[in-house]
């Protein structure tokens, strides 16, 4: 990729945290060259247009595509980046030799579970994380033990104790080993800890806050300060673990699916977790099932995708595929199908949906248009066209496409000044649209892109109107016949099968159709009105329609203009005037 290609691709990326991947090759032969994280994907990727090192410059030169995935937080991006580097081992990433993983919190699979911070969770454990700040995690685990008394000793020590250990004396363990607390009560305390990691911060934050306030009232300021710091760690920890998947129930691998429908196609985003850690993500495109919604997308995707792939232990979706055969097949393969309504899994499903709905990839037409033009992703595009009959009865159309689909409730049309000047008519049409937008008289959202039906002259006229009114929206034109895409800076001659060209052609053709339809409506109005005028036969009526186009134009015509039409003398002209007054 050269610098211009990098800038074009960067312009299509969202201003959100996430990870980006420079890749070589396409489709099944893609090789990941480099993985990076970003607080702002667009700005970070744009910086690669001017790489600071020779190594990265070579990487950019070899790359053919740039893929990405959005995350909710910068921390999630950091964790996903680390796991993608581990999985793909990209040649241009610098990897630590010990290749250590991030800390996790586990509740062991035991009737009296222990809680601990670990990088290597035990089989069957309920795992939370990963987290980036080990010190903060340890502070939270200690606070949980102080509040609920969960043990931290090994199973061997637990089974061989005959009296409470020092942890009991320190108040961080309730000594279930010697029966100081019953298993049922201990299980309730363990459940409270689970609720904290599943998102109920208050089970720990609320008692800490009460203790802090009491210490402050008793002027125990040092203790109050310590409790304040501990409370801060407890509340901050949830900002790190949003992508964690609980491993309770023996689920070592989990696929989280999010689906979105975009016109005639559907996008499915898959997030893959292993051992509680998000380690992979991808997006897939398929035809959208007719009238079935996203449940139909899941029903089509699951059997196709997993037919020749290893099934995970669990699949989470935003909604069930509503197909008993699929559910029976998954059950027979030992796969749990779930639709989480709340908690950490539901948060991860939301993230999968966010990735599915995220435009700007290489699969959608508007995303490719953004790539090709180097602009922000144009989810909302308005098209403009002018139609007239020999300079008379000029009308303008303004159509709207949202996510590549016509939004007919946002179509508008306008009668234009009667003059045989395409540029002036386009300038008037755009001035009307822009003025209404700037003055707040148009209830439609501002578009991301304007498409002008015409060539350089029409585009220039439109841009004049935009500059005059101060409406800051990018505009391009699609020229007829040669199908050239014209921007203020250059002219694009794309291949006939280019997806981005197909999108512009659909918008241009729809704007033209809507303008012609409106013009025909006005002509029909003229025809209907002229039917009642004595002395006007079918042929004369056709000549009037071709010459004037609208009732207003006929009404405004002079005697000389009317009598210039074959079949209309002075008396007929006077009759026309009388009937149209």
Swiss-Prot record:
Q: Which GO terms describe its biological process?
A: nucleotide-excision repair; SOS response
All copies of the GIY-YIG domain together span 15-94
**Where does the UVR domain lie?**
202-237
Where does the UniProt annotation locate this protein? Cytoplasm
Q: Does the keyword DNA damage apply?
A: yes
Q: Which GO cellular component term is one of those annotated?
A: cytoplasm
- Top-rank taxon of the source lineage equals Archaea
Q: Which GO terms describe its molecular function?
A: DNA binding; excinuclease ABC activity
In terms of one coarse class, where is the protein primarily found? cytoplasm
Database matches in Gene3D superfamilies: 5' to 3' exonuclease, C-terminal subdomain, GIY-YIG endonuclease, UVR domain, UvrC, RNAse H endonuclease domain
Which residues does UniProt assign to the signal peptide?
A: none
UniProtKB keywords: Cytoplasm, DNA damage, DNA excision, DNA repair, Excision nuclease, SOS response
Spell out the InterPro entries in the cross-references.
Answer: GIY-YIG_endonuc (IPR000305), GIY-YIG_endonuc_sf (IPR035901), GIY-YIG_UvrC_Cho (IPR047296), Hlx-hairpin-Hlx_DNA-bd_motif (IPR003583), RuvA_2-like (IPR010994), UVR_dom (IPR001943), UVR_dom_sf (IPR036876), UvrABC_protein_C (IPR050066)
Please report which protein family the annotation says this sequence is part of. Belongs to the UvrC family.
Oligomeric and partner information: Interacts with UvrB in an incision complex.
Query: What is the recorded function of this protein according to its Swiss-Prot or TrEMBL entry?
Result: The UvrABC repair system catalyzes the recognition and processing of DNA lesions. UvrC both incises the 5' and 3' sides of the lesion. The N-terminal half is responsible for the 3' incision and the C-terminal half is responsible for the 5' incision.
- This one is known as UvrABC system protein C
Native source species: Haloarcula marismortui (strain ATCC 43049 / DSM 3752 / JCM 8966 / VKM B-1809)
Protein's gene: uvrC
